[in-house]
Amino acid sequence: MMWLASLSLVLPVVAGQAALYGQCGGNGWTGATTCVSGACCTYSNAWYSQCLPCSTTLTTTKSSTTSSSTTSTVHSTSTATSTSTCSLPSVYKWTSTGSLANPESGFVSLKDFSAVPYNGQHLVYASDVNNAGNYGSLSFGLFSDWNAMSSASQNVMSHGAVAPNLFYFAPKNIWVMAYEWGASPFMYMTSSDPTNPNGWSSPQSLFSGSISGSSPIDPALIADDTTMYLFFAGDNGHIYRSSMPIGDFPSNFGTSYTTILSDSTYNLFEAVQVYRVKGQNQYLMIVECIGANGRYFRSFTATSLGGSWTPQATSESAPFAGKANSGATWTNDISSGDLIRSSPDQTMPIDPCNLQFLYQGRDPSSTASYNLLPYRPGLLTLVR
């Protein structure tokens, strides 16, 4: 995701106005619905509108808010890109950065990235692994350019949240972080300030169920207008789904689930993520797999989150992302990560015109045990 050079622009804030890159509308939003001078309230989806520089806007429309006044907004992406729409490609080809950051002293690995846009910058949480092979979690200090990730602070969380899944839940104006390995298979915490890694609420159970012969792993949350969905894997060749009415979230999904995809163990292994494709009546699911040449991702599409999924890019030789098409020279593995979202809300929107993927890679010559493999962040950018 690329933000405008005008990030450095400072606009005067008047009482009752939302700041540049602040929220200004959406269903359930009770805050300011007008922006500071020079910024326009920009529609992203029914739950989220954001103050963006007016110079990036083209066409006006009305946003959905519960306010008594209606704000004139424009159709532009939350990443301040063009208003054009794109389809997902049938064949993917990427370019890749090198390693973007190294773990601090005492740690061997940075993994499982979850990234959201936040006030015009990137906010990233991740799992970390220390020299003894023990897992924890951290946040990176805010940064505007991916090349600056290497110098961003790494802020260890006092309460570990392994495999974090971070988003803004607009209906209740809170930030949510889901994760694994707690009192229940999946847990969640909430916060009003996601930049404070130790400002999260006490953990609550997100899912209490079990799966035969394995354990639930890698929670992925996404919502439509009426329903919140939980997708997860099991390192066993299956992908699972649970759901609840959106008005009940955040709370425990309980123990019930549906198996929605089945294949061999390595063909549907872990790290499932689900996104809404902007400008299309389509959702994208990616799943990490194990191949002859390392970790790679297969992709599936659907027209509804509660519906069936159609294979899209599913072979190791022509994957969604892997050694065959990543363009990376420093890693064979394209492993657990997050597509860069165009806004941070619970609908998980991605812009296929500007698709990027924050992933974990590693030196392929490393022979350490899995927990001690030297994973680092890298960024793929789709070649169109």
UniProtKB/Swiss-Prot annotation:
Per its UniProt entry, which superkingdom is the organism in? Eukaryota
Q: Which InterPro entries does this entry report, sorted A to Z?
A: CBD_sf, Cellulose-bd_dom_fun, GH62_arabinosidase, Glyco_hydro_beta-prop_sf
Which EC class heads this enzyme's classification? hydrolase
| Chain coiled-coil ranges | none
Q: Which cysteines share a disulfide bond?
A: none
Q: What is its subcellular localisation? A: Secreted
Instruction: Name the Enzyme Commission number(s) assigned to this protein.
Output: 3.2.1.55
A Gene Ontology term for the protein's cellular component: extracellular region
**Record-level GO BP terms:** L-arabinose metabolic process; xylan catabolic process
Record-linked SMART domains: fCBD (SM00236)
Reaction equation(s) it catalyzes: Hydrolysis of terminal non-reducing alpha-L-arabinofuranoside residues in alpha-L-arabinosides
Q: Name one Pfam family in it.
A: Glyco_hydro_62
* Residue intervals of the CBM1 domain: 17-52
Question: Could you tell me which residues belong to the region Disordered?
Answer: 59-85
Q: PROSITE patterns from the xrefs?
A: CBM1_1 (PS00562), CBM1_2 (PS51164)
- Recorded GO terms, molecular function? alpha-L-arabinofuranosidase activity; cellulose binding
Which keywords appear in this protein's UniProt record, sorted alphabetically? Carbohydrate metabolism, Glycosidase, Hydrolase, Polysaccharide degradation, Secreted, Signal, Xylan degradation
Extract the signal peptide range.
1-16
Q: Where are the transmembrane segments?
A: none
Applied biotechnology uses: Synergistic reactions with other polysaccharadide degrading enzymes such as lytic polysaccharide monooxygenases (LPMOs) are important for industrial applications.
In the record, the note on similarity to other proteins reads:
Belongs to the glycosyl hydrolase 62 family.
Function noted in UniProt: Alpha-L-arabinofuranosidase involved in the hydrolysis of xylan, a major structural heterogeneous polysaccharide found in plant biomass representing the second most abundant polysaccharide in the biosphere, after cellulose. Releases L-arabinose from arabinoxylan.
Name of the protein in question: Alpha-L-arabinofuranosidase A
